[in-house]
Amino acid sequence: MIDLLIIAGPTAVGKTDISIELAEKLNGEIISADSMQIYKYMDIGSAKITKDEMKGIPHHLIDVVKPHEEFNVSSFKVLAEKSIKDIWNRGKLPIIAGGTGLYINSLIYNYDFTDADRDEKYREYLTKLAEDKGKEYVHSLLKDIDEKSYEKLYPNDLKRVVRALEVYKITGKSISEYTKENEKKLYDIPYNVNYFVLNMNREVLYERINKRVDIMMGKGLIEEVKKLESMGYTPDMQSMKGIGYKEVLFYLNGDISLDEAIYLIKKGSRNYAKRQLTWFRKDKRSIWIDKDKYSSEEEIVDEIIKMVKDK
């Protein structure tokens, strides 16, 4: 079984430095789990690690696609699994470092992103049937094949009714049976996972976030966004909707002032950190590291290594 070390946490908590120190001490390589750092040319706004900051530690899944190219959790899972195997086969430890919770979960839970359990044509047929004969009629189709769902779901909950009918058509099983089987598969992964979440005092974290935004502005975030625009990348692209980029675009378009843009970037980043912490708290397998309780990052690194070895 492959050993997998995960260093997660909210934006600006200090995942980068700790993951690099761990990689140095544990002979590891780092796989980024950051939904913005996968984009080329978007360096300042994503707080992308520089070559110097890497300290010679190989980093994977950074600068993977151009800003107009599609990239999602399924894309991440495929590339990350390939990198994990490659790193492990070379006798090194794969270390996942990042704050995109869904990316991390795609690895530590056996999510299936294939379309094996989907039938778009049948779904369209049922939706059209609901328009022609009514939602109650489509709901009644469940009665003979999935009585539990028939009793549980309301006719107005068309999306879930259609999903239950679709699952039965493809698998011959009720949605509850199907879900139960999939839940068992969720934990069937080829990794021995050590999952750590870094945290710190909320006020201190927010101060760090605000300072990071000021640093980004000083490094030339506005110029970076201007360059991206000149390269043909537009506000409707997923990459350009990232925090920092969308606000600067509003400023460049004359919709808001520069001060307002900076305020919104800071606010958006703080709210994002709050959402990240909420996400990570849901996973009972994660071990939380309160950075405030340690006198140095080296102490944190040593504590993580001790916990990994004692497991």
Swiss-Prot record:
Write the Enzyme Commission number(s) for this entry.
Answer: 2.5.1.75
Reaction(s) catalysed (UniProt annotation): adenosine(37) in tRNA + dimethylallyl diphosphate = N(6)-dimethylallyladenosine(37) in tRNA + diphosphate
GO MF term set: ATP binding; tRNA dimethylallyltransferase activity
Provide the binding site for ATP: G9, P10, T11, A12, V13, G14, K15, T16
Q: Which InterPro entries match?
A: Dimethylallyltransferase, IPT, P-loop_NTPase
Q: Which cofactor does it need?
A: Mg(2+)
Site-annotated residues for Interaction with substrate tRNA: T100, R123
Kindly list the positions annotated as binding substrate: T11, A12, V13, G14, K15, T16
Q: Identify the stretch(es) annotated as Interaction with substrate tRNA.
A: 34-37
Q: Which UniProt keywords apply?
A: ATP-binding, Magnesium, Nucleotide-binding, Transferase, tRNA processing
Q: Name one Pfam family in it.
A: IPPT
Instruction: Give any single GO term for biological process.
Output: tRNA modification
Q: Which domain of life is it from?
A: Bacteria
The UniProt function text for this chain reads: Catalyzes the transfer of a dimethylallyl group onto the adenine at position 37 in tRNAs that read codons beginning with uridine, leading to the formation of N6-(dimethylallyl)adenosine (i(6)A).
Q: Which NCBIfam families match?
A: miaA
Which protein family is it in? Belongs to the IPP transferase family.
What is the annotated quaternary arrangement, including any partners? Monomer.
> What protein am I looking at?
tRNA dimethylallyltransferase
Q: Which species expresses this protein natively?
A: Clostridium botulinum (strain Loch Maree / Type A3)
The lineage is:
Bacteria, Bacillati, Bacillota, Clostridia, Eubacteriales
- Tell me what gene encodes this: miaA
